[in-house]
A protein has these predicted regions:
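Conserved C-terminal helix/tail region of periplasmic/extracytoplasmic solute-binding proteins
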Residues: 97-136
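A bilobed periplasmic-binding-protein/Venus flytrap-type ligand-binding module shared by bacterial periplasmic
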Residues: 11-26
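Alpha-helix initiation/capping motif
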Residues: 1-2, 17, 67-68, 96, ...
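Secondary-structure end/capping motifs
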Residues: 23-110
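Short beta-strand->loop
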Residues: 1-9
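Residue-level signal for pocket-adjacent positions within structured domains
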Residues: 9, 16, 90, 118, ...
């Protein structure tokens, strides 16, 4: 995995333009906890969601092959190897500032992007999280 080599990205993190964070704060305050809980619910019982995904893959017939067995394996592996896990603070979906800084350092070095003008706090926020939602 890429993370095994030091690039511990936040896979599929919700992104919002910084100019929109304040203006969409009410929406984000409602949406983010729903997304947190959905991840926990899926981790605890993926059967209904996996069934729907497999059904839609077949229905849309885009060439992607995804079986019920593959869905179950992906779910189980995600939990087993820590791809799906609470943040270092025990909250589902939280960002760790040191981890964000590490990602910024890698992007700066290898992508030639000047990240020195930004801080982890400017790049990611835990502002809209419900601290009570976790895998426990």
């Amino acid at each position: 995995m890429v993370a095994d080599n030091g690039y511990e990205e936040y896979f599929q993190a919700l992104s919002v333009r910084s100019d929109d964070v304040e203006g969409q704060a009410d929406c984000l305050s409602a949406l983010v906890p729903v997304m947190q809980q959905a991840q926990v619910d899926y981790a605890e019982d993926p059967s209904e969601t996996n069934e729907l995904i497999v059904e839609l893959v077949e229905e849309y017939d885009t060439g992607w092959v995804y079986t019920a067995e593959a869905a179950e394996y992906a779910h189980d592996q995600g939990l087993e190897i820590g791809i799906v896990a609470d943040g270092s603070d025990g909250v589902m979906g939280s960002f760790d500032e040191a981890r964000v800084q590490g990602l910024m350092d890698i992007v700066g070095e290898y992508a030639g992007v000047d990240t020195a003008a930004f801080t982890p706090e400017e790049m990611a926020t835990n502002q809209f999280l419900d601290d009570s939602i976790s895998l426990g």
